Curated annotation (Swiss-Prot):
Pfam family, one: Ni_hydr_CYTB
Topology within the bilayer: Multi-pass membrane protein
Protein location: Cell membrane
Molecular function per GO: electron transfer activity; heme binding; iron ion binding
Originating species: Wolinella succinogenes (strain ATCC 29543 / DSM 1740 / CCUG 13145 / JCM 31913 / LMG 7466 / NCTC 11488 / FDC 602W) (Vibrio succinogenes)
Cited InterPro entries: Cyt_b561_bac/Ni-Hgenase, Di-haem_cyt_TM, Hydrogenase_cytochrome, Ni-dep_Hydgase_cyt-B
SUPFAM superfamilies according to UniProt: Transmembrane di-heme cytochromes (SSF81342)
Transmembrane segments: 23-43, 67-87, 134-153, 188-205
Protein origin, superkingdom: Bacteria
Gene Ontology cellular-component annotations: plasma membrane
UniProt protein name: Quinone-reactive Ni/Fe-hydrogenase B-type cytochrome subunit
Length: 230
């Protein structure tokens, strides 16, 4: 059991991310990385195994299989993560960030801080408004790439799970304007992830270097540290 605070020494330790939140973060990170690599290979097979007379070396089929496995893993983990964010008691401090998101003054102070023109604002939750807005944008991207990925899946696999998904998602395929548009949206959304990842890493590193009281460490340990006030 993780304690909420450790009052020994000159710092107090506060739990910022629960174990499930941290595990889901890294599962999604690995899944997104694998999906990007395999997705680009599926779109443009840049490696081809040496041809032989035996039914082996199906590299394209292997890439597609891994793409599907990690795609469904991303969907499952994201659904559970959204559930935790809304209902889990351990995520109360994350939900509190919503009040900073709708506060114009907090937005102003946070942007001023990013421009090195002012101190870091006091926040009610874990995320500052820019972080929470980016996190919500990421959820929209995951939703979009998941829906388009499911549509592409059932257009290849017509029986079993594919038949069930076809009955549910076919109206969305029509709404998107057909399979060609779905594939284009899926590909464009992939590039949105490619852009998001280095920006996310840079901002997380910048924030950790400027305010070394947890930062990136917290997504590993779960804790953030604050100086004690006597």
């Amino acid at each position: 059991m993780e304690n909420r605070a450790n009052t020994e020494g000159t710092f107090e330790r506060e739990l910022e991310f629960t174990a499930l939140t941290r595990w889901f973060h890294w599962i999604r990170a690995i899944a997104i990385f694998v999906l990007i690599v395999t997705g680009f290979y599926i779109a443009y097979p840049f490696l081809t195994p040496i041809k032989n007379s035996e039914p082996t070396n199906f590299m394209y089929a292997l890439a597609r299989s891994w793409h599907q496995i990690f795609g469904f893993a991303l969907i499952a983990v994201t659904i559970f993560r959204v559930y935790l964010f809304i209902f889990d008691k351990g995520c109360r401090v994350e939900r509190a960030s919503f009040w900073d998101l709708i506060n114009p003054l907090t937005w102003f102070r946070q942007l001023r801080n990013y421009m090195l023109l002012g101190p870091h604002p006091h926040l009610k939750g874990v995320y500052n408004p820019v972080q929470l807005a980016a996190y919500m944008g990421l959820m929209v991207l995951i939703l979009l790439i998941s829906v388009t990925g499911i549509i592409l899946y059932y257009n290849v696999y017509h029986d079993g799970l594919g038949a069930i998904l076809f009955a549910i998602f076919k109206p969305l395929e029509v709404m998107f304007g057909g399979l060609a548009n779905v594939r284009a949206i899926h590909h464009i959304t992939t590039w949105a992830f490619v852009i998001f990842i280095p920006v996310h890493i840079y901002m997380a590193t910048w924030n950790s270097a400027r305010y070394p009281n947890g930062g990136i460490d917290s997504i590993f340990s779960g804790f953030r540290y604050h100086k004690k006030h006597y």
